[in-house]
Amino acid sequence: MEYQLELFKMQRYKGDVSLDPDTAHPRLELCEDGKSVKDTGTIRNVPKNEKRFDSHLYLLAKEGYTSGRHYWEVDVGKRSSWALGIARESVTRKGTLTLSPKNGFWVMGCTDGREYWAYTEPWTRLSVGGKLPKIGIFLDISAKQLSFYNVRKKAALYTFTIADGSSREGKLLPFFSTGPATSKPDTESLKMVQGVDDDD
């Protein structure tokens, strides 16, 4: 009941999050409304720019935050691999990257459809009963916390403490990944959840 109430309160801060195609790895394809992304399995002909991730299947949201409280939900469906969270606007976009707070990423994810991890150093294994089809993410900048929730079970999954950073590091942006680049891609989309469904 405690987490049910907590999640309900956080959902009041739900905002509109759109994915930024200019940051998306060339294998990733966004829908026209910018609310979902999938791995096409092929390198698409997209404009090169400094914002684009070129070595991992990552992308960021268009909107960034420097203050306040913000909540969003992502439907991961039946995907076996994914990662979600936030990244500093200043993160490196080119070459091999490691998802970790010291590199400007506060992220949790799923590997092999069975194991859930917080990408700390070293990784922290998360205890999750069953599948996680929908993830709630709550960013409280004044409290310096990022929390993940199992929306279906209304249960807390993990909370990061965000290190104090200077304004030079820029905004915090929602982060998304469809997982490792494999030869046989999982083409199911990651989708932004538009409303709050009390039944889920």
Name the predicted role of every residue range.
Residues 1-200:
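Beta-rich ligand-recognition domains in immune and ubiquitin systems
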